[in-house]
Amino acid sequence: YDGSILSPIQHHLSINHAIYVETNRDAVESVFNRLKEFYKNVYKRPNATLMYDYIDLRENCIIVKTLVTESPLMEVDGIKVPTLEKLLVDTQKDADFDYLHGSESLNMYQLAFEQYSINTQRLMRYAKRRSISKEIQELINLSK
């Protein structure tokens, strides 16, 4: 999926031209290596330090990550993409979204709940799967 899909729920717009490729744990290495054959800026499971120091999201890049089992996905034109619920949880958990933490997190949740129909049950189920249900529940409570 394209990182710019987060723009509509951001208060302080951060440019994100990254393409995120999520695949099962066993395939991450081979997907990463295959993409490196064709593209210049490909990163495998980057941590927050790598994101801040070396990855410029204003430029095109590809970030290869492990797809968490039981992730809420939907199909668009035959391609599985993350639901908004998945993105809301992942932005709080994943190091590559560290730049969205802090006050921006609350702004994102407020805008998401104002502008979209959020399936709270799906959101909380996935948050529990990612072991951050308490944090997500706090954001939900503060955003309403």
Give names to the regions the model predicted:
Residues 1-58:
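Short gly/ser-rich loop at a beta-strand->alpha-helix junction or flexible surface loop bordering the NTP-binding
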Residues 39-144:
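Hydrophobic alpha-helical interaction segments
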